[in-house]
């Protein structure tokens, strides 16, 4: 299916990763209902989840963490502070409330 929506957020202050993740989680829940974060990227530290997902991607257009999430049903990307942080989500769908 692939990503069907991208939301851009600006988070004020210097709350770092925790503040960005909290804001992204809220935006994702408002858009998808019950959902889970399948992947993330932190530009400042170069940290991504799943770890090392982009290492084998070289010059590919799509980062490894994004491809990982999309291939597992993710449909929403939340970009915080102009790409300082990226979080990718999927709805729990039939698993919601279980």
What residue spans do the PLM features occupy?
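Contiguous hydrophobic, core-forming segments of folded domains
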Residues: 1-2
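Short, non-transmembrane alpha-helical segments in secretory-pathway proteins
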Residues: 5-49
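Generic structural motif
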Residues: 12-14, 72, 83
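Exposed beta-strand-loop-beta-strand "reactive/processing" segments of non-cytosolic proteins
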Residues: 39-81
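A short, surface-exposed interaction/processing loop segment used at functional sites
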Residues: 80-98
